Structure formats: C-alpha cells, structure tokens
Amino acid sequence: MGTQAWVRSLVLAMLACPTGSGAEQADNPASSDYARPQRLVEVEPGRRLNLYCIGEGSPTVIFDSGLAEPASTWFQVQPRVAKQSRACSYDRAGSGFSDAGTRAGSSAHIVDDLRRLLAKAEIEPPYVLVGHSYGGMNVRLYYYLHPDEVAGMVLVDPSHEDQTEGYRMLSPRGYTRAQWRALGDPGIATRRECVEEASKGFEPGTEAYRRCIFDAPSQMPPVLQRAYLAMQQRPAFHQAQLTEEASVFAASAEQLQAARRSFMNLPVIVLTHAPDTSPLRDWETPALRKARTAMWHNLHAGLADASARGVHRVVADSDHAIQLSQPDAVVAAIIEMVDMARQAR
C-alpha cells in the first residue's frame, strides 16, 4: 500500500462505521422506524432535518452519528435508552432522510443546525449529548459553545482534533504538516467524483459503484441495510460526505482547538474500542500498531481527564462502531449518565 493509502486508512478508520464484526442483523421491532422519515423539521426556509424522538423524561438524550452516517446506526441503543428517558436521534444535512446542506459540514455548522433543530422541535435542555466518531467532536463543540444546556456527555470512540498530528508524528518519513495534509487530497478528489457520479445514478458492478457505495453495517437487519444503500444513491449524501470529510480535520479541528477548555464538573464518559487483534495490514508493523493504539487511548484519556467527573473505559470485543458491535456497553453508559444528570439537579 502506498503512503497516501496508508494515511487514508489511518484517518478514515476512525471516522466511519465498519461493516464487519459483531452480532449480525440484530432483531429489533423498532428497526423499521429508522428506514423511513420520522419528523421532518424545517431548520431554515426550504431545508429540513429528519428527527426521531421516542420515550419520555428529562434530560433528553441527543445522538449524533459518525461522519455522514444516518441515525439508524443507533438502532440497537436509542430504543433501550428511551425506556429511561426521552431519546432523540437525527440525520445531519444530506444524510439519511434529511435535505441537502447549504454549507460546509464543519462542526460549527453542524452544532448550529442541531441547535436550530432542537429549538424548532421545542426540545428544551438539559441534554445528555452522545456522539460517535465525528459526532464526538460535534457534541464537544456544542458543550464548549452552550455549556448551560448540557447535563452530561457520552463520547463513543470519538474522533479528536489532534489525531492527524499524532498520525503524522508516527510516520517514519518526517512529513511537514503541509505535506501531511496534502496526502489526503486524492481521497477528497474521489468524494468529488462520487458527487458527480451520483447525479447520473449508480449501476451495481461498475467502477463508480465500487468506489462510492459502501456495504451497510452487518449488524443492521435487512430493512435498514436496504435503507442504508438507498441513502447512498442520493447526490445529497455524497455532498455531505465530501463536505464533512473535507472539514473534519481542517475547519472542524481548528474550531475545536480554538474553543476547547475544561469540562469542569460535567459528567463525561469516554468509550474506546478494544485493541485491534486482526492480522497486520501490509503497511503495518507491530510497533506501529502498538503506537497507534497508545495514541488513541491517550487522546481519549485526555478527554476524560478534562472533567472532574470524567471516566474512560475500553470496551472489550468492540470495534470503532461500539454502538453496533457492543451496544450493551453504550446503553449502560448512557443510562448511567442520565442517572448522574438527574442526581445533580
């Protein structure tokens, strides 16, 4: 594998939901709810976001997904949390059943969209914010900008604004920051090509389909797998994927770096996926994998340490999408957080 592919594998492995491990096609009666629009809320004239709220009670739990991922990635978690408190998931602009975005998919724009959505839907704080991967960056920025609205956070294998610098430091080739950023350009170019191809329509078996359409997570039941694949036929989805991927470690990282501060006494639980035990890739060495794992754990431990009530847990037998591979651990952390938020009143 070439250097560019190596970099892309490192970075994107921590952004999107994998399609592999875990119990497959879990039986969940509520699954079909995620396969169709629920409440389409207008956040600005002519643009709507899909919102799905179930359950009752305060604080309201808000779910934010990984990069360009739909709300359906929480199908094994949200219904169970809703037995304890109100729980709301949503599709970001262009993802799932939401309308296309009108601006870049940076964390600042995502936070602004989410706040508009909650206001229009009359969902009042306090909130327990739950973010997976890129969603972890988004909910952290929400807290930094609006701390009085947040009662607690659960960060599910969250991406981190400093992770690309960590990867650069692990590279044996001594790249400058500018050179390192440039290594991601071919991936962004591919996303642009997918936007163009989506406007024409994808045909299974073609090169464009292979490059642009990803399998649904294997844990999803067939009804959600079909919806996941149908989502990827939409030009709006590929535009969202392009703008979020272009923003996550550029504009979004800068926004987090500028805004970040102590969580003070805010309850925070950080969940980290288990160490990778799969065979080494052709670009990996045992030392590199060990260093990469240590860096990831250290970044997550730092997030927990930013709170006087922070907890960091490594979830056994999990992959990056812990909510799919080990949903029990995520449900338990959220319910624990809801209880802490209620006790703090």
List where the protein language model places each region.
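Active-site loop/oxyanion-hole signature of alpha/beta-hydrolase fold enzymes
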Residues: Y52, S89-Y134, H146, S171-P172
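Catalytic active-site module of serine/aspartate enzymes centered on a nucleophile-bearing elbow/loop
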Residues: A306-R345
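Conserved HGGG/HGGXW glycine-rich cap/lid loop of the alpha/beta-hydrolase fold
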Residues: V43-F97, L145
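N-terminal cap/lid segment of alpha/beta-hydrolase-fold proteins
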Residues: N28-R48
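Conserved hydrolase catalytic core segment
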Residues: E124-L170
